[in-house]
């Protein structure tokens, strides 16, 4: 296909146009008074949403070059989402501000490479400062505050996540389900999560989120490699008759068998998903045995004289629900407490008997996985559209609280970044010079952009609010919900330090890449043929 090649200023301006479009559509959602965005869906009802990264993923422009700009900023949002699970809108606003200021300087003749160096040095300085400012989380009250802010000021959600963390521990698994009622409820059940995702993306049942969700599945556990599809056929036939889904957890599934499973899944013959077993060697077998206990099934292993081709339905485990994405699998089981407790006691005995610190650590890990359970939040809403929005907000809140537990919290509402701007100005003027200093100044100017946008969305003057906040003590900021200047930590307006840090780093990274772009190669738009006259309908005849 023919390509279009654009150089220099023209290339950067085209990228900028795409970036402007995406940044504006995402920025309207920022802050407690941020608005919603409606996404049109090809099938089903439109989706009303307040989540930056979801909006960013939906935007596709007709112009290929502008679309490249959209994709770059989308990357800042999705990388922040992968690292911290929240703060995607902030990352987008920061990246946009840095790109706009940087392009002005490049157009005026500044050297883009030196500017990028300045941006990188300023970012390193700020990351250290954010670390110094962060306060470790000590009680469930702080966890609740974090969840509340991330869920768009929903106190009920914040409290529920704090309760869930109390029950399953800070490392515990919190899973989301669509509830059957109007209210959102919390339930703690047996279950476990392990770090292996689906073997093939074709197993995903929800292609938008790339997740496989199996309700009340049978679970086949085996410690052997499945190479021949003939070994699986008897089990597949038995499960297909019941009409229930099947999850296969095995050491590995080789090409032929995997292809057969995928084809059956795509044709709708059997809802099946396959996952590699976690761990290695003896530890893998022990973890599979733990899963067998949890799901009330048997581990099909030749050590116990069991062969895959002779497996029957009563050897398979069952669970209430299994959720699998590309990296992790979560099994939510129920009604098997006695066996699980007995297995936990057995692991504790092994821990007492072993002298090796490594073995103790691994046994402790298994014990935590088995005994910790899974907190299931059942999302309640009046309509499906509200349910989807609520689910995304809850997901942000869960991710934000986990990030807060990891790296602590900082004052929220864009306050921390705004307060760091003067400190960065002092540091850069004494440590950097020339165009590197200009690069640092670009970052300094961008630091107030999230706060300004939050204020503007609440109907205040962003520039005035930003200057007022800078002149106040470090923890003081602007509460956009009430329009007052308050101590953010006391008011419970907090952000996880990890979210603030990731957003800043990803924004600076993308800004640096855009500024140093000198050429774009993109597809030429396809020419549409003007439709020729149909057969038997002579083009030039008069009728």
Swiss-Prot record:
Q: Give the CC-aspect GO terms.
A: cytoplasm
From its record, what is one biological process in GO terms?
A: protein refolding
Which InterPro entries would you find in this protein's record? Chaperonin_Cpn60_CS, Cpn60/GroEL, Cpn60/GroEL/TCP-1, GroEL-like_apical_dom_sf, GROEL-like_equatorial_sf, TCP-1-like_intermed_sf
- What reaction does this enzyme carry out catalytically? ATP + H2O + a folded polypeptide = ADP + phosphate + an unfolded polypeptide
Which SUPFAM superfamilies did the record assign? GroEL apical domain-like, GroEL equatorial domain-like
- Enzyme class comes to isomerase
Which keywords does this chain's UniProt record carry? ATP-binding, Chaperone, Cytoplasm, Isomerase, Nucleotide-binding
Q: What's the Enzyme Commission number for this chain?
A: 5.6.1.7
Quick one: which residues bind ATP? 29-32, 86-90, 413, 479-481, 495
Q: Chief subcellular site?
A: cytoplasm
Example GO molecular function: isomerase activity
The record's Pfam families line, in alphabetical order, gives: Cpn60_TCP1
Q: What does this protein do?
A: Together with its co-chaperonin GroES, plays an essential role in assisting protein folding. The GroEL-GroES system forms a nano-cage that allows encapsulation of the non-native substrate proteins and provides a physical environment optimized to promote and accelerate protein folding.
Subunit and interaction comment: Forms a cylinder of 14 subunits composed of two heptameric rings stacked back-to-back. Interacts with the co-chaperonin GroES.
What name does this protein carry?
Answer: Chaperonin GroEL 1
